[in-house]
Amino acid sequence: MHRYFIAHLIALVIILVLMPETKKVQARQNAQSPKPAAASSPNLEGVWEGPLDVGAMKLRLAFKVTKAADGALAAKFRSLDQSADELTVDVVSLKESAVHFELQRLAVVFDGEVNQAGSEITGQFKKGGVSFPLTLKRVAKPTTLNRPQEPKPPYPYDAEEVSYENKRDGIKLAGTLTLPRGKTSVPAVILITGSGAQNRNEELMGHKPFLVLADYLTRQGIAVLRVDDRGVGGSTGSVPDSTSENFAADVMAGIEFLKKHQGINPKQIGLIGHSEGGLIAPMVAAQSNDVAFIVMLAGPGLPGEEILYLQGALILKANGASDEVLARQHASQEKIFTLLKQEKDIAVVEKRLREEFDKQMANASESAKAQGQQALEAQLKQVLSPWFRYFLTYDPRVALAKVKCPVLALNGENDLQVPVTENLREIEATLKTAGNKDVTTVRLPKLNHLFQTSETGSPDEYGKIEETLAPTALKMMGDWILKHTHSQQ
């Protein structure tokens, strides 16, 4: 959300299901692109762009290469569908036609060959041991990301840089509190990000959803606290060793902070959680009487395992996977998930997963096996993490049944990560059966998991869509919160 659940969805599925097919494509590309016998090094200066196919989506990558007066090469890297930020390439080299880029902090290496025309670089993009074919083409005009909803200063409200402590876990949390100017005792919300380490703006795919949401709500007279996740920005701690329970404790600390702020009405503090954040919000509301309301944005209503089955099939189907691939994926997921649930010893789980990998790759080529082995090492860390094991078996209905405050649950009809029908149905049924009389669930047409207006809902579209948050979703949240805090303007 949002890394959402995608990273975990493809954790071993890419290896066990898609990797052999990917390797075949790579082999065909290599056969069609023989290594040129370059007499001298071509000109590498300029902008090079190309799509990286990682199975569940395609990410557009860009390298901008410059040359100093002394001939030294330098480069900047951008993942166009993930962030607008440029990152410095640590190592840039060109020897005859061989190109080498390294981004050490991201564990990224690209090795390629420039064609004789100097218009294309064909090679391998490696990230943390996983290798994918990548073809970069020289472009005259770099691709720019247009994000028209991102607010620009000056703002008609106040913004405070804040920090506070989660005393239970010894974590310092840092964020931004936006406050309606010239008002006191205003309602407030805490924004809760989706899975993975994200900054206070929930920045992903070149979008900053929580920045846009905070700006909109604060203009409506609602204070908004958005916070860096553990280990991100100004916050301490670590995400890999944490579970949703730990993140819920972080939110509880945020509530205590807001209760003491002189500009906030302590009886009108609510939570807005996106994706996994929509799982955490009910956890907190079930424990604390200080939560006045919650908004679940694509929040789960089913156990993690069930969501991953649905999610995996929908995303692969949207990307053109055959029924055979879908069946193989489900079977592989089922084996992995059953093992994770039944075996508590991590060492035993790892051993069994390696054996399963060897079995699945038995008929693959030697080169495919080598590539798959690299991917296995990188992805094992994810499925063996405390977070994944917790998420797999956690049933959000247990906490939902204890939530007594008003609830607004929104899902996009094109959401392929937290499918709308199954999850909204369970959320509504659980809350109402438990006696909650103020429950609103809404299906929003054409909106995806990020609440963007979309064509298919595939994660492949996220970064390509200019809209960050659909105005219909923003207005629905703002109106509902104002109604429930009696603060209509």
Language-model regions: role of each:
Residues 403, 409-411:
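Short beta-strand/loop motif that positions the catalytic acidic residue
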Residues 34-128, 149, 156, 162, ...:
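Central antiparallel beta-sheet cores of small beta-barrel/beta-sandwich binding domains
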Residues 253-323:
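Primarily recognizes the serine-hydrolase "nucleophile elbow" in alpha/beta-hydrolase
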Residues 295-402:
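Accessory cap/linker subdomain of secreted extracellular hydrolases
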Residues 53, 142-184:
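N-terminal cap/lid segment of alpha/beta-hydrolase-fold proteins
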Residues 416-424:
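Conserved alpha/beta-hydrolase "acid-adjacent" motif
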Residues 209, 241-262:
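Alpha/beta-hydrolase active-site loop
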Residues 184-186, 195-225, 304, 416-417:
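Short substrate-entry loop that stabilizes the transition state in hydrolases
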